[in-house]
C-alpha cells in the first residue's frame, strides 16, 4: 500500500561504567575519619528500546503517524556505588530501584492547509517504570500524557519556519521504601519551540 509506511528499530542495552569517580562527604570534623573522600566505581545500565513506527497518508493534505516503544527498564534494579576506602560506617551504597519494563505510545497528525502552511497536533502516553514505593525526589516519575501542537510556514523555496508547543502535567503521591520519604511530586511543563531553516 503506497499510503502506508512501516518502520522497526532496536537499540540494545548499554552499560555505562564509572571507573574513577570522586566521592566527597560533608560531615562534622569528628566524623571525617569515618567518611573519607576518595575514588568510587559504579555501573548504570541503559535500557534496550524497541520501536514500531507507522505512517499513513490519507491524501495529499492529511497524514498520521504512530509510534510504540518497548523500553527495558527492568535492567535498572539497583544503583550501587563502591568506594575504594571503606570503614565501619562507610559501606557500599546500594539504592534499590526495582524498575519494570514499560511502553510509550505517540500519535500525531499533520495537515497541509496550502502549499505554504502546515499545522500539526499530537498526543503521547508514557507509562512509568517506577513501581510504588520506589519514587525518589530526583526522579519523581509517573505516567505521563503530553499534548503537542505546531505550525510550519514555507516562506520560500529556501526559507522554512516551524513553531511548536508541548504541555505536560503530572502528579504522583508515594512513599519511598528505602529512604522513608513520603511526598507528593508535581511536574508542570509548558515548552515552546521555534526552528528556522534556510537551505542554500
Where are these regions (language model features)?
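Outer-membrane beta-barrel porins/channels
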Residues: 1-200
Amino acid at each position: 500500500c503506497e499510503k502506508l509506511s512501516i518502520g522497526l528499530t532496536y537499540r540494545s542495552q548499554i552499560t555505562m561504567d564509572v571507573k574513577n569517580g570522586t566521592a566527597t562527604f560533608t560531615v562534622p570534623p569528628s566524623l571525617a575519619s569515618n567518611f573519607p573522600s576518595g575514588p568510587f566505581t559504579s555501573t548504570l545500565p541503559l535500557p534496550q528500546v524497541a520501536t514500531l513506527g507507522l505512517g499513513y497518508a490519507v491524501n495529499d493534505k492529511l497524514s498520521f503517524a504512530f509510534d510504540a516503544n518497548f523500553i527495558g527498564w527492568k535492567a535498572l534494579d539497583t544503583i550501587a556505588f563502591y568506594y575504594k576506602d571503606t570503614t565501619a560506617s562507610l559501606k557500599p551504597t546500594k539504592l534499590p530501584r526495582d524498575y519494570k519494563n514499560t511502553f510509550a505510545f505517540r500519535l500525531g497528525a499533520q495537515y497541509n492547509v496550502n502549499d505554504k502552511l502546515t499545522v500539526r497536533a499530537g498526543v503521547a502516553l508514557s507509562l512509568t517504570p517506577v513501581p510504588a514505593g520506589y519514587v525518589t525526589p530526583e526522579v519523581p516519575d509517573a505516567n505521563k500524557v503530553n499534548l503537542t501542537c505546531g505550525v510550519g510556514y514555507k516562506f520560500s523555496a529556501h526559507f522554512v519556519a516551524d513553531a511548536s508547543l508541548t504541555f505536560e502535567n503530572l502528579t504522583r503521591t508515594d512513599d519511598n521504601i528505602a529512604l522513608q520519604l513520603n511526598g507528593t511530586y508535581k511536574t508542570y511543563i509548558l515548552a515552546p519551540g521555534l526552528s528556522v531553516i534556510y537551505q542554500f
